[in-house]
């Protein structure tokens, strides 16, 4: 038994590190420079190398802006920092179902089960061969090493095939996932959305003041404009009515004057006709006097009539 135990080969186990070694910082003089920047008593923000994600922003980046007065502007929120390597989904596009971890767990369980079975079989074979005689020690050890190597290779091949099948899903599975996602309409997975910061505007406070005081000013100007238009319309209407009244008065005066002129013409025509009649009568009377009294008597009468007219004019 002693010789068989001494001749049995044993596998050297690799020492496993309990904790992952943290790589050194890329800037060894970081602490001194940050103390000089922040002051002797200040402690800088934690900084980790690229393999380790940090939820806090880098110390050399500015934080949120200080609060300012509302009339001059509002503080713009600084967007949150996310760990590197994350996938940000578009708001209008759904994300595929995150079925990777669920499928990997059964594969790991199967691989661990197979490895445990292979180890138990190897331990049983090793015990049986140790109990057998020392004559078959060399052959048993060689067979055991061959079987152990083949079992390890088979396990590794099986694990690689399972991982390949998990990493490369079939076309049917992809169609099924797409159809289930389109029917349910729910986005699976906890991928954070990138927040959209509001657009900066330098006239925020001015807009607040102008929006509050601009409405009354606009209303007052509009009222003044309406009143001015109304007064202009009323003055134009009054002037139009006054001119219309003057035109009507002038028209009436023209009509009255034209009627009076026509009446005067008619009177003149009547008087002229009467004058003609009187002249004709006078001529007829003179002719009859000359025929009765003679021409000398008629001449004396004319002289007497002219002298009487002159005396009346002098008196």
UniProtKB/Swiss-Prot annotation:
Altering residue 247 to L: what's the impact? Significantly increases DNA binding activity
Show the ranges annotated as biased composition (Polar residues): 133-164, 178-187, 249-262
Residue numbers spanned by region Disordered: 1-56, 93-268
Q: Where in the cell is it found?
A: Nucleus
List, in alphabetical order, the Gene Ontology terms for molecular function in this entry.
Answer: DNA-binding transcription factor activity; sequence-specific DNA binding; transcription cis-regulatory region binding
Keyword annotations for this protein, in alphabetical order, are: Disulfide bond, DNA-binding, Nucleus, Phosphoprotein, Transcription, Transcription regulation
Residue ranges for the region (Basic motif) are 224-243
Leucine-zipper, as annotated region: 250-285
Q: PTM details? A: Phosphorylated by CK2.
Instruction: Give GO cellular component annotations, separated by semicolons.
Output: cytoplasm; nucleus
Q: Where is the composition biased (Pro residues)?
A: 46-56
Q: Which Gene3D superfamilies match?
A: 1.20.5.170
**Keyword Iron listed:** no
InterPro entries referenced in this protein's UniProt entry, alphabetically: bZIP (IPR004827), bZIP_plant_GBF1 (IPR045314), bZIP_sf (IPR046347), GBF-like (IPR044827), MFMR (IPR012900)
SMART domains according to UniProt: BRLZ (SM00338)
bZIP domain: residues covered: 222-285
Q: In which tissues is it expressed?
A: Found in both light and dark grown leaves.
Q: What does this protein do?
A: Binds to the G-box motif (5'-CCACGTGG-3') of the rbcS-1A gene promoter. G-box and G-box-like motifs are cis-acting elements defined in promoters of certain plant genes which are regulated by such diverse stimuli as light-induction or hormone control. Binds to the G-box motif 5'-CACGTG-3' of LHCB2.4 (At3g27690) promoter. May act as transcriptional activator in light-regulated expression of LHCB2.4. Probably binds DNA as monomer. DNA-binding activity is redox-dependent.
PANTHER family recorded:
G-BOX-BINDING FACTOR 1, G-BOX-BINDING FACTOR 3-RELATED
The family note in this entry says: Belongs to the bZIP family.
**What binding partners and quaternary form does the record give?**
Monomer and heterodimers with BZIP16 and BZIP68. Interacts with GIP1.
> What's the name of the protein?
G-box-binding factor 1
Supply the source organism for this entry.
Arabidopsis thaliana (Mouse-ear cress)
